[in-house]
Amino acid sequence: MLARNAEALYWIGRYVERADDTARILDVAVHQLLEDSSVDPDQASRLLLRVLGIEPPDHELDVWSLTDLVAFSTNSQGGSSIVDAISAARENAKSAREVTSSETWECLNTTYNALPERERAAKRLGPHEFLSFIEGRAAMFAGLADSTLLRDDGYRFMLLGRAIERVDMTVRLLLSRVGDSASSPAWVTLLRSAGGHDTYLRTYRGVLDAGRVVEFMMLDRLFPRSVFHSLKLAEHNLAELMHNPHSRIGATTEAQRLLGQARSELEFVQPGVLLETLESRLAGLQTTCRDVGDALALQYFHAAPWVAWSDAGQRGQLVGSQEES
């Protein structure tokens, strides 16, 4: 597979996941701000912007200014707004039409073309419908990719990108709650933002506890958005890309080593000590995500720099642009 196609598919996976996760987080935050008068809108908005890696403005924030920054801003710092993420996913799909299905392309293209109308409706009726639209389109894209794409290297690159983005987003969510009390309602907000509230309640029979929430989000083997599950998925797809499933010496590349090390540390950690070392462990996982991106760029993408949240917008969105220059 051409390096530009591999990289485009990898970033399609990341950008669609980024748009989906950002919509989920913003939707929960907006509901909280509108329904709970005890929450300070400016403080809560700044915390959310910090989670998403967006530089907060100097003026005071409310629901509407927060929505404009997170959902509708273009050329955002880090390319982390929902509109920018969808635009970038669509541009990458456009550059790799020969390795994507018509259905997945039409899904992204239709979503992109509907953004202006959906934005106007959101400013009249509120942001919930827009955010639900993004979540639904991301789910549709995932379903179409699952049902129409060959299980080849391109599909594996897309899943690899999605898995790494999920690790990064879950880590950011947990970092925002470091230092909160065990009984803080913010833990419920975290679970809702990750789409795991109902699953958590079924798993732990409705008992809300900070330690269990951290265990669930970090270690659960069955919840698809947990850090462990996402690392395992990334590690599996990278191993499939290596085309050497029976290697007698284990990890042969830097990306494999980094993912395997992060996964094994979580696999054998004592759950009871997670809260005690949470901040340092999360910081280490963020570093791992960045280093894995660098290693993949060197190994597969002709050493193209990894697009971090802080410089994604400066990348120009279209992966293939470097090939053309």
Place the predicted regions along the sequence by residue:
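Alpha-helical transmembrane segments and their helix-helix packing motifs
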Residues: 1-325
